[in-house]
Amino acid sequence: MKVICLAIGKPKLSFAAQGVREYEARLQHYSSLSIEYLKARDESAALLSRSEGAYRIALDERGTQMSTLEIAQEFTRLEGRGEIKSVAFLIGGADGHSSSFREQCDATWSLSRMTMQHELALVVLLEQLYRVYTLKRGAPYHRE
């Protein structure tokens, strides 16, 4: 299953950009991953257009919270559905996602109840995806 991460704006914080590069390199061994940075003009339309045909997951503080193991189980469930060829994680800009945008997505997940910058949300997402893929490959998990 292809994983697409769509974010509004490139990371400007040097440590966030470094974190993205680190996890992007790690994930290349496990998954077909692409990260795309979109311009802030009409971000909802841009995110929806670029994710057309994918299973859309909006990342928003109002979404469903899951543990790493629950995310891994959800990935396994999505992979088991043959019609889903790609999953797109949609990270909005500073104002987050509107309720009408979230309704157009297949799911809304929360990385935390805390508000965080969108560039940090991308790093947290990639780190969790890395954990999910290592778990799926049978790596030991210290939380079990």
Locate each region found by the language model.
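Conserved RecA-like P-loop NTPase ATPase core
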Residues: 5, 57, 92, 125
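Structured adenosyl-cofactor binding patch, chiefly the S-adenosyl-L-methionine
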Residues: 99-143
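Short glycine-rich anion-binding loops that position phosphate/pyrophosphate groups of nucleotides
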Residues: 11, 61-64, 93-96
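Conserved strand-to-helix beginnings and helix N-cap segments that scaffold or border functional pockets
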Residues: 17-20, 68-72, 102, 122
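S-adenosyl-L-methionine/SAH cofactor-binding core of RNA-modifying enzymes
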Residues: 30-88
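Catalytic beta-strand/loop module used to bind and position nucleotide/cofactor moieties
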Residues: 70-100, 107-116
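Short glycine-/polar-rich loops that comprise or flank the Walker A/P-loop
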Residues: 1, 54, 104-106
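N-terminal beta1-alpha1 ligand-phosphate binding loop
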Residues: 1-23, 27
